[in-house]
């Protein structure tokens, strides 16, 4: 089985953390590459991961969320301490490159207008009054998701083809 790539990372408050050390804290780790904190779609996903995190823990799984946001940006968010999982700050995009998580070729290529999930998320954004914040990183960055066992085996990977092409919590739970 293919091994997940190990890396050092920083959070809003800590530097020099090791991914392999974090992975050993649970049977399975959901490594999610999102865009940045100012992105409303990413905000919506973050809220869902937080609300449903107990389901991951019931499976002895954890989330490690990678954002292009800086530690300073995360520290400015008053609710950052309430996020129940690790949020990795990668403003230079080094981890995106390490895991070959690419960006869309153009802003239009980021969206699939025929994707029901896109429209469902757009409606949810409006209902929750989520607004676009500061731009950070590569604006055309696409998300990705990897499932990693406690011994660093990479047993599932998903590279998004559009901004809304990321597995739902229900889909992730089934894969665990």
Segments from the language model and where they lie:
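Structural microenvironment flanking redox-active thiols in thiol-disulfide oxidoreductases
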Residues: 45-98
């Amino acid at each position: 089985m293919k091994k997940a790539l190990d890396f050092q990372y920083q959070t809003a408050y800590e530097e020099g953390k090791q991914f392999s050390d974090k992975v050993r804290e649970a049977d399975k780790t959901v490594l999610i590459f999102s865009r940045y904190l100012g992105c409303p779609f990413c905000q919506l996903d973050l809220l869902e991961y937080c609300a449903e995190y107990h389901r991951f823990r019931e499976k002895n799984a954890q989330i490690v969320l990678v954002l292009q946001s800086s530690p300073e940006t995360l520290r400015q968010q008053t609710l950052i301490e309430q996020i129940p999982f690790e949020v990795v700050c990668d403003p230079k995009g080094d981890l995106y490159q390490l895991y070959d998580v690419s960006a869309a070729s153009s802003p239009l290529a980021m969206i699939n207008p025929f994707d029901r999930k896109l429209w469902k998320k757009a409606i949810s954004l409006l209902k929750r009054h989520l607004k676009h914040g500061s731009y950070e990183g590569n604006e055309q960055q696409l998300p990705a998701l990897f499932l990693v066992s406690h011994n660093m085996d990479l047993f599932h990977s998903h590279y998004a083809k559009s901004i809304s092409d990321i597995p739902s919590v229900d889909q992730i739970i089934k894969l665990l």
